[in-house]
Amino acid sequence: MRKLKFIFLNIFIFSILPIQAEIPIVAYFGIPLEYSNVNRFKEFKEAGFDVSICFYDDTPVDTLLRILDDAQKSNIRLIISSGWVSVQPHVGIPRLKNHPALYGYFLQDEPWPKDISETKRRYQAMAKQDTKKPTYVNLLPNYGDGMPREIKMPPYKQYLQQTSAIGLPFISFDFYPIMKSGIRNTWYSCLEDIRQESLRTNKPFWAFALCTPHCDYPQPTIESLRLQIYSNLAYGAQAIEYFTYWTPKPTDEWDFHDAPISINGHRTRNYKLVKQMNQELRDLLPLFDKAEVLTVNHMVKIPEGTTKLQRIPTNIKKLKITGRQGAIISTFKKYGHLYMAIVNKDYLSDMELNISAKKNVTMITKQLKETTAKSKYKIGGGDILIFKLK
């Protein structure tokens, strides 16, 4: 009888969540035109990606349709950047929009404040041709890299409100926090602003992780990827984007190298790394898909623009963090249950957690199994620990 009860419990745990989440794992700068074929899309899928943002310039629409056919064979969907989409949407979009492998259309990356009105005009022209599939615009981070000095960046909240007026279906922004000198000190304040704008507009947000080293950005590790991705999820991100999958051509300003796939089409050491991260992430995503994030607080080190945890969550009696950078404490609802996610903000060292909770509190593994909560945990660099509170 005990065995039967145990089997029933496991079945129940797995049945409360969907088998596959709708949170996509996206690659910015996916497979280039000359490599866009069935085998490359299969390789892309094996790395754990769902959506490729592809830049095809003025490639004929017939060729784009062939590429979409190839992507469909590996269950990959594309966000397409092409002049036939963004410059002549009345020509390209009607022919592309019904293809099942088309996720959406790329319009612009990091629009400057002075460009927002023109971006809105172009967005409306594209959306007029397809009211169902999204048009993608990715926003600047709050540090505004790449903007000429003569162009003044407004307060970030104001910039977000200006871009929201475009009418985009979701908020996508990039922020690459981990540098050779340490973590950018405005990262979490940027996430706070993005989350608040998402709540204000009732639009989901997409967030990035950097896996392509260049300039002052170091070689990624599993710990640095975890920190970026799990911080994004703790704040409520509904898509995880990677910059990049394919190595972009280096420039005098940006010395890109060692993306998961090299500029010549060979796998680098980061292909295996990203694949490992995505395999881990895939199991967790159903829990965060469309979850309602209630609170996001910080413990130990309180970054600029964030809130210190003042009151421990429901059904938790004691919560103590021992670690250099401290933790994010996020509470969220999913299917009527209350959860708490704890993220170690230090990707270079472990963090200790001492916790006392009521008997009904359980720990959720990364495979979404409920286990008995313990009183002590060691959370690896950048890693996440999740509890079901009620």
Predicted segment positions?
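Positively charged n-region of N-terminal signal peptides that target proteins for export
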Residues: M1-K5
